[in-house]
UniProtKB/Swiss-Prot annotation:
Keywords of the record: Allosteric enzyme, Cytoplasm, Hydrolase, Metal-binding, Protease, Sodium, Threonine protease
Enzyme Commission (EC) number: 3.4.25.2
Higher taxonomy: Bacteria, Pseudomonadati, Pseudomonadota, Alphaproteobacteria, Rhodobacterales
Pfam families given in the database record: Proteasome (PF00227)
Any one of the GO CC terms: HslUV protease complex
Domain of life: Bacteria
Compartments it resides in: Cytoplasm
Organism per entry: Jannaschia sp. (strain CCS1)
Activity control summary: Allosterically activated by HslU binding.
Binding site for Na(+): 168, 171, 174
Protein's UniProt name: ATP-dependent protease subunit HslV
Oligomeric form and interacting partners: A double ring-shaped homohexamer of HslV is capped on each side by a ring-shaped HslU homohexamer. The assembly of the HslU/HslV complex is dependent on binding of ATP.
GO biological process: proteolysis involved in protein catabolic process
Broad EC category: hydrolase
């Protein structure tokens, strides 16, 4: 699967599912360098707690770039406590206009349990439809699988885990070694 097939997307899969008063963010653990799997147990889903305000973030793309963005998001959340949308928009504005940040290659899914966003380097802060956010090379596979399960009796974690299992069966840059974080509304 050539990188050009998923412009701006990178070898991983992250999904956020909101259902039943909870949001679950799950990410696989595979790190690839070209056609080689370098690591199978990376943690691409993190919990931030600036000022006691819990936020769960998942990232696809360069790890160093993602950590830079997570640090900036945490600073924005400290400056605007309890306002995830505002902090996300401020991060996206900086990311798009700052010459240093423009070079960062990553995408983020962020949630505080009630709001769920995808943040991109193009300046987008997207609130996904159908209570599902998915990014990365296997994101479309996970998104389609999760949408097919949302009307079932499965809870948010089961939907996220099952969607990730399907994505890992299809996308060679995604494995089944998951990190899962749950946050309540």
């Amino acid at each position: 699967m050539a990188k050009e097939e998923f412009p701006g997307w990178h070898g991983t899969t992250i999904i956020g599912v909101r259902k039943g008063g909870k949001v679950v963010v799950a990410g696989d653990g595979q790190v690839s360098l070209g056609p080689t799997v370098i690591k199978g147990s990376a943690r691409k889903v993190r919990r931030l707690s600036p000022g006691g305000y819990d936020v769960v973030c998942g990232f696809a793309g360069s790890t160093a770039d993602a950590f830079t963005l997570l640090e900036r998001l945490e600073a924005k959340l400290e400056a605007t406590p309890g306002q995830l949308q505002r902090a996300s928009v401020e991060l996206a504005k900086d990311w798009r206009t700052d010459k240093y940040l423009q070079k960062l290659e990553a995408m983020l899914i962020v949630t505080d349990g009630s709001e769920l966003y995808i943040i991109t380097g193009a300046g987008d802060v997207l609130e996904p439809e159908h209570d599902i956010a998915a990014i990365g090379s296997g994101g479309n596979f996970a998104l389609a699988a999760a949408r097919g399960m949302m009307d079932s009796d499965k809870d948010a974690e089961a939907v996220a885990r099952d969607a990730m299992a399907i994505a890992s069966d299809i996308c060679v840059y995604t494995n089944g070694n998951l990190t899962v974080e749950t946050i309540s509304a």
